[in-house]
C-alpha cells in the first residue's frame, strides 16, 4: 500500500465490477428481515436465493 491514491483506484475498480446496482429492499422484506440491510448481516439461504444477495452483506463506512 503506497498511498491514498492507490486505495482510491482499487475502490473505483470494485465499483466497475458490480454488474448492477442493488435494489433497495421492499417494505415486505424490511418487515420480514429487519431494516438493517446495510449493516453486517448473516443471511439464511432462503433469503439469499430470494433477493440474489451475497451470503454476508457487509457495509464499511469510509473512515473520516
From Swiss-Prot:
The domain of life is Viruses
* Keyword Metal-binding in record: no
Induction / repression = Expressed in the early phase of the viral replicative cycle.
Keywords noted in UniProt: Early protein
Report residue spans for region: Disordered. 1-28
Extent of Basic residues compositional bias: 1-10
Known InterPro entries for this protein? Poxvirus_F8 (IPR008726)
Compositionally biased tracts (Basic and acidic residues): 11-20
**UniProt family annotation:** Belongs to the orthopoxvirus OPG052 family.
Q: Name it.
A: Protein OPG053
Query: To which species is this protein native?
Result: Monkeypox virus
Amino acid at each position: 500500500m503506497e498511498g491514498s491514491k492507490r486505495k482510491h483506484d482499487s475502490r473505483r475498480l470494485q465499483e466497475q465490477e458490480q454488474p448492477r446496482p442493488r435494489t433497495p429492499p421492499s417494505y415486505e422484506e424490511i418487515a420480514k428481515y429487519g431494516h438493517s440491510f446495510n449493516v453486517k448481516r448473516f443471511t439464511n439461504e432462503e433469503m439469499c436465493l430470494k433477493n440474489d444477495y451475497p451470503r454476508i452483506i457487509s457495509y464499511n463506512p469510509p473512515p473520516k
